[in-house]
Curated annotation (Swiss-Prot):
PROSITE patterns: BRIX. Residues 79-260 form the Brix domain. The gene is IMP4. Its main location: nucleus. Component of the U3 small nucleolar ribonucleoprotein. Required for the early cleavages at sites A0, A1 and A2 during 18S ribosomal pre-RNA processing. The keyword Thylakoid does not apply. Keywords: Nucleus, Ribonucleoprotein, Ribosome biogenesis, rRNA processing. It is found in: Nucleus, Nucleolus. Component of a heterotrimeric complex containing IMP3, IMP4 and MPP10. This is U3 small nucleolar ribonucleoprotein protein IMP4. It comes from the Eukaryota.
Amino acid sequence: MIRKQARERREYLYRKSLELQESSLTEKRQQLKAALASGKPLSKELAEDKELQKDFIYDESEQTEIDDEYSALSGISEPKVLITTSRNPSVKLLQFSKEIKLMFPNSIKLNRGNYVITDLVATCQRVQISDLIILHEHRGIPTSLTISHFPHGPSIIFTLHNVKLRHDLPEIGNSSESYPHLVFENFTSELGKRVVKIMKHLFPPGVKKDSSRVITFINNDDFISVRHHMYVKTKDTVELSEVGPRFEMRLYELRLGLLDNKDSEVEWQLRRFIRTGNRKNYLG
């Protein structure tokens, strides 16, 4: 009987302590929500509370399969990519768009004509396009590449640098239509992994092991070098032949919506006019 009473008392005290801890944590959570709603700074006690830090992780939000815009495409279905240009393109931009089409298997090239963005997005939704790529230029030089994923985003904008077309490269090789192997190097941050996911889902899955085609994306100080090669195995070595095009990309903006939604949330944007704007590496 004495042992039973002692056990019951310990259990009661334990439950009581849990209730007190839970009520204290609930009160702190309410204080935290009130501070967030009003915009007031957190008290030192709330800011340093480890239990609350487990509940509210603001720097790296947890991603689930429901949040993943590419879960339907991942390794199952082939992407359907539409490539177009800005209106009234120059000869060089048209040629660049043709060479970009050769990089993405099963892609479609569309002459822009008088299409505005809203009509272009509506057309892509109607024919079940998975990704839309738009190339822009300034005075005949390709300057930006925009990718918008359907049906609900994201949309990503890269600036283009040092664009070399196939005829600008020495000893150019012949391009193949086989599915390419993809190489991504030095994309170690969460933003870098996000960029990799967007880029790799432009290419179809199911690459054969004996495919001799390789497309490489190498991040160096947030400039992504894009190279397109064919390789041939000899007795002792592997010989690479560049087939082009060759260019560098720099991430400018990442939005959560489609191109026609001007009010979509900006997930990330390059801001150069801050103290660390040109010194910090964001992709890796």
